């Protein structure tokens, strides 16, 4: 697992509320906008995270799938 993938999963796991793309991106100073966006899309395609659109934020918010939560708690 790449460091950006691991860091994104950690950010989503530790966030008080489901973080938006902007919140995830702002915490990853070493990654580009494109790297973060592509990694989030790949994680969602693989079923590791779930996103939903938040109209008030005009962005998607992300949370971990049950499968990942189970793996992270072991």
Say what each PLM segment does.
Residues 17-27:
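Short acidic, hydrophobic short linear motifs in intrinsically disordered regions
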Residues 1-10, 58, 73:
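Short alpha-helical segments that sit at the start of domains
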Residues 1-2, 17-18, 33, 61:
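Alpha-helix N-cap/helix-initiation sites
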Residues 54-74:
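Short, cationic-aromatic polyanion-contact patches
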Residues 10-16:
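Short, locally clustered residues in the helix-turn-helix/winged-helix DNA-binding domain
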Residues 44-54:
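A short, conserved structural fragment
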Residues 30-45:
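Short amphipathic alpha-helical interaction segments
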């Amino acid at each position: 697992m790449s460091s950006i993938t691991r860091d994104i999963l950690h950010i989503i796991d530790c966030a008080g509320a489901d973080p938006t793309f902007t919140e995830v991106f702002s915490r990853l100073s070493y990654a580009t906008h494109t790297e973060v966006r592509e990694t989030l899309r790949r994680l969602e395609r693989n079923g590791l995270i779930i996103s939903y659109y938040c109209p008030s934020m005009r962005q998607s918010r992300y949370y971990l799938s049950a499968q990942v939560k189970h793996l992270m708690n072991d």
